[in-house]
């Protein structure tokens, strides 16, 4: 509390946090030695609400229920209901296993590692990133394409455990209860059906190296990372209770699945097979372990991923939602960029549909939406800083289809992009 020593303001009270006087705020709340204004109270409440949003509501046992986990995933990821259910149940059971082992020793609950299979741009990595945001156990993501067998140039598989250890602030006990997501797992498939042709240090060799840490072993991890040497001290991390989630696009797997069960015959009685016209995500639903073996995963590796969740192709409606609904939606990002030029950016509903259809044609999923928007808005973003009086830019379906230019709306007239100098 502070007072001004002159005039009538001698006894004026001030907020101890923001310094505003009692005349500048609606309410000033007094404590034993401090004062706080209503504005600071509201700010504190906003901070608390934001923190509560990012934390899961716990059930009676202190374990987030699958529905609670799925509800948070729904706020960030559009569609993929089945994959969300699988992940929610797996994470819920992971929590239960950890609690069970601290209370009982009669029945040992084995972990169920997860394999996520879905077309590129369907949301596999985003699901994992969202889990990392909402969980209260250590979480790390690794890229399988950077891994090699021990002794070769590249990252050892123990580096994955090191990243988890770093996420747990080098608390070994917390790291041993964490979750690891390995992306691009399909890129370490065996390069040949014949395992004895040559040494495959970045494919089958990595699968062999991952087997033990996924099953459960005590890994020796160098605290500073890098290669191991005899004089180095190691941290011992038990991976038995670490949940592993692997994800990959598995390009070409749909052909293996489609060909399974088809009988080839010749002659007049031969059956004529129509070409597969289903979408990739629909075909992935029928995946079997034998299909993964043909793709190039070794049997032991497939056996350590008992739970398989497939993701669907994103349809036009889902892609339109992705463009506008999430908190950091692409359209919102570009609208913010245009706001910096004091210009409003508007997309017609038909334009959003055209963008979604383009992404489907390119088979890039949600990942390709940004490149499409970038190409549509490139010329406008180039011209806009040099133009005066533009209040709004409207993107129509014709603009997306490259048959028209964006519409510029000025304070006193409308004009077409690129024609402003001619009519000025």
Curated annotation (Swiss-Prot):
Gene3D superfamilies membership: 1.10.8.60, ClpX chaperone, C4-type zinc finger domain (6.20.220.10), P-loop containing nucleotide triphosphate hydrolases (3.40.50.300)
Stored InterPro entries: AAA+_ATPase, ATP-dep_Clp_protease_ClpX, ATPase_AAA_core, Clp_ATPase_C, Clp_protease_ATP-bd_su_ClpX, ClpX_bact, P-loop_NTPase, Znf_CppX_C4
Keywords, ordered alphabetically: ATP-binding, Chaperone, Metal-binding, Nucleotide-binding, Zinc
Binding positions (Zn(2+)): 15, 18, 37, 40
PROSITE patterns from the UniProt entry: CLPX_ZB
An annotated GO BP: cell division
Binding site for ATP: 119-126
Domain ClpX-type ZB, residue spans: 3-56
An example Gene Ontology CC term for this record: HslUV protease complex
GO molecular function, one term: ATP hydrolysis activity
Function field: ATP-dependent specificity component of the Clp protease. It directs the protease to specific substrates. Can perform chaperone functions in the absence of ClpP.
Family per record: Belongs to the ClpX chaperone family.
Protein name, entry field: ATP-dependent Clp protease ATP-binding subunit ClpX
Gene name for this UniProt entry: clpX
């Amino acid at each position: 509390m502070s007072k001004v020593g002159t005039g009538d303001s001698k006894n004026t009270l001030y907020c101890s946090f923001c310094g505003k006087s009692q005349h500048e705020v609606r309410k000033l709340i007094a404590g034993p030695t401090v004062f706080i204004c209503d504005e600071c109270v509201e700010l504190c409440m906003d901070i608390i609400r934001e923190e509560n949003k990012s934390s899961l509501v716990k059930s009676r046992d202190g374990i987030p229920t699958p529905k609670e986990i799925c509800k948070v995933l729904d706020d960030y990821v559009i569609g993929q209901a089945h994959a969300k259910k699988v992940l929610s149940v797996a994470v819920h059971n992971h929590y239960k296993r950890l609690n069970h082992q601290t209370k009982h020793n009669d029945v040992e609950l084995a972990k169920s590692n997860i394999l996520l299979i879905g077309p590129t741009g369907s949301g596999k990595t985003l699901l994992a990133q969202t889990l990392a945001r909402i969980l209260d156990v250590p979480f790390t993501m690794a890229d399988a394409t950077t891994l090699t067998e021990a002794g070769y140039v590249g990252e050892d598989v123990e580096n994955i455990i090191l990243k988890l250890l770093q996420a747990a602030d080098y608390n070994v006990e917390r790291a041993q209860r964490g979750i690891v997501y390995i992306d691009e797992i399909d890129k370490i498939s065996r390069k040949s059906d014949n395992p004895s042709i040559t040494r495959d240090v970045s494919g089958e060799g990595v699968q062999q190296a991952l087997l033990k840490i996924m099953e459960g072993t005590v890994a020796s991890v160098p605290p500073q990372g890098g290669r191991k040497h005899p004089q180095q001290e190691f941290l011992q991390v038990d991976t038995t209770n670490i949940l592993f989630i692997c994800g990959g696009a598995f390009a070409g797997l749909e052909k293996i699945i489609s060909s399974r069960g088809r009988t080839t015959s010749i002659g007049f009685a031969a059956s004529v097979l129509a070409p597969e016209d289903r979408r990739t995500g629909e075909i992935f639903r029928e995946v079997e372990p034998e299909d993964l073996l043909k793709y190039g995963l070794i049997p032991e590796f497939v056996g350590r991923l008992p739970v398989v969740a497939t993701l669907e192709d994103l349809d036009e409606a889902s892609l339109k939602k992705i463009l506008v609904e999430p908190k950091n939606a692409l359209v919102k990002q570009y609208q913010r960029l245009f706001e910096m030029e004091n210009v409003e950016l508007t997309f017609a509903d038909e334009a959003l549909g055209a963008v979604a259809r383009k992404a489907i044609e390119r088979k890039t999923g949600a990942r390709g939406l940004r490149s499409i928007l970038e190409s549509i808005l490139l010329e406008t973003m180039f011209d806009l800083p040099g133009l005066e009086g533009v209040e709004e830019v409207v993107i129509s379906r014709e603009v997306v289809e490259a048959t028209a230019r964006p519409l510029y709306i000025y304070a006193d007239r409308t004009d077409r992009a690129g024609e402003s100098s001619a009519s000025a």
